[in-house]
């Protein structure tokens, strides 16, 4: 595996491989890689002759600068993991390489980007679209891989691809969990042992809510989850919403649509964790 730091060098390598008819998969990451990322990389390696993994902590998507400072940066360990997964290139640019001048582009995909994360992290998805569109333009991949843990982000990127007419396939990949059910996240590394124990309640509650939902209404299921999370000292619920998996708009009853997802964000101490669960999938 080769580590590349500039767009120019990456494009020089890729143009040769594309000329040979090789398919290129892109896995955009912010580093601090774990088994969830590894599953995306392995899927790309399986489906494309060439896999590029970007490792870049994107400053424009952090609405909380403190979160940006604290975000773990572990490039050496990341490269070892990527090599083991069979990636062809790790693309690790500097901020100056990706943003030679400030990116003033404004992306608006309402109502997808105005609810949930969009409401609580203003500017976040604009930053995501800035960097992902730059990566798509630099790499011009045939496929790009994103985890379903960031469910709203995946929906917004699909819409961005549609509106900007990028010629590529977006591949959504299932959430990867620890054996005990906790959704893998780079932020889990910041949890104390006690916080880690509390955080388990998030996925446990979501799984229980799926059984509960089979015999209860949407509003009863919302209350079931809210009550279970708020009962745990050390957890603070930011939001839990039950939405149409395509439009991300709230649903009032289970029969409203064939694709229903529950999306949750919880502060565990000062670490913000997200998760989701599918109640109905067509």
Curated annotation (Swiss-Prot):
Catalysis: reaction(s) = (R)-pantoate + beta-alanine + ATP = (R)-pantothenate + AMP + diphosphate + H(+)
UniProt EC number: 6.3.2.1
Alphabetized, the UniProt keywords read: ATP-binding, Cytoplasm, Ligase, Nucleotide-binding, Pantothenate biosynthesis
Q: In which pathway does it act?
A: Cofactor biosynthesis; (R)-pantothenate biosynthesis; (R)-pantothenate from (R)-pantoate and beta-alanine: step 1/1
Q: Where does ATP bind?
A: 30-37, 147-150, 176, 184-187
GO terms under biological process:
pantothenate biosynthetic process
Protein name, UniProt field: Pantothenate synthetase
Organism expressing this protein natively: Bacteroides fragilis (strain YCH46)
